Amino acid sequence: MNNLIRTLMVQTPTVPGNLGRVATAIGNVGGDIGEVETVKVGHNYTMRSITVQVESEDQLEELLEAVRSLEGITLHTVSDEVLHAHEGGKIQMKSKMKIESIADLRRVYTPGVANVCRAIQEQPDKAKIYTSIGNTVAIVTDGTAILGLGNIGPVAGMPVMEGKAALFDQLANVNAIPILLNVNEPKEIIQTVKNISPGFGGILLEDIGSPHCFEIEERLKEELDIPVMHDDQHGTAVVTLAAAISACRSTGVNLKEAKVGQIGLGAAGIATCRMFMAYGVKQVIGADKSPEANERLVSYGGKVADSLEELMENCDIVIATTGVPGLIRKEWIRKGQIILALSNPKPEIEPEDALEAGAIYATDGRSVNNVLGFPGIFRGVLNAGVRDITHTMLVAAAEAIANSTRPGDLVPHPLNLKERLLYTERKTAFIDNKQGCLEIGSLVCFLSKIIRK
């Protein structure tokens, strides 16, 4: 499933209905239309740029032929704007200071920098003040679980890491540097991250396959004194919990008293179960074809269903993160259920089919995006200066996202032009019984809030 995006330059006669003919032709072959921009209006014609999305090269060819066959309409060019946008990469490292004189050089580099080095040597915490370390996150991947592409290697996964870095910068003013590791053994990844950790204020683990991701994150959280989070686990779980809170509010369902079923117990599924239990859901039931995954859920306090049918029959809320399109059958849907089929690009069941079968609420993964979570979570922990990201903090982040959602929406849209990204400070107190200490901190949680002009 390629999910190809192309931009068509289409010329139509300046007569009402011709744009509709083009849209109909695209829709008839299953293409999705994105942006439509008028490029030029001539004496008797209109030139438009039309962005379309299809699932395969064959479907793209069928779509192009359908547009070309329209009488009086000319398809001039077909371009890959996504590929063009990636030329040269999406991120860069630049100096914050201009160096235009000898005085500038002395302040920025030698000899002035020596005094700063000595100050940090005497008081290491001053590195957070006098360097970029305190506002810089490493995005670490081994390329074994890149989006829906699988084990394609770290270099092929670099565009994803650059995208994450760009979002960190634009949404939370956090510096983020992709770190590509050409190793696959957990102990090698752990040791490498430990070795480079002095240069960062936090570590975001990204697209590292299951089950290695669990060991890697747990070990790094134990052994490093900076916050570590695996986004495929906890970023996904935060936004999923926020979506469930919103869905329950709109339907009158008591989330904490509901039976929650999780189909698929990989990185995202296990973390989602743990997140719901941390929120206070009393009954969390999972299902996975892997005995090891099922055992992991039980070790965290969840239960395992004997079959998908049993889970569907008994659960009020069903979440699916399997990557298997059409896995959930319509006849399994129980009246009044909430269905969050979150796999991309195709869900386990289409929302329309779930609603038709009796679900009270249904959605797919297109609106449940990690971008609502990871930038603000790290902005929060970097501001607060905490060494660990706890479930208490993650639940607070999910609640902040849910509380900023407009009525009728599932979650906020972070890039809505009518919205601005703000931060709300929430005080978080939690007890670490293992260490027997009380830690009180401030967590700045990411949210998107309407500013009415």
What are these regions (language model features)?
Residues 435-448:
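Short, often N-terminal, low-complexity regions
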Residues 88-115:
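Helix-enriched interaction subdomains in cytosolic or periplasmic regions
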Residues 300-362:
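Rossmann-like adenosine-cofactor binding region
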Residues 227, 231-232, 343-436:
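Adenosine-phosphate binding glycine-rich loop
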Residues 140-141, 148-149, 155-159, 185-235:
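Phosphate/diphosphate ligand-binding glycine-rich loop within oxidoreductases
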Residues 99-102, 141-151, 166-178, 197-200, ...:
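Gly-rich Lys/Arg/Thr-decorated short loops/hinges at beta-loop-alpha junctions or inter-strand turns
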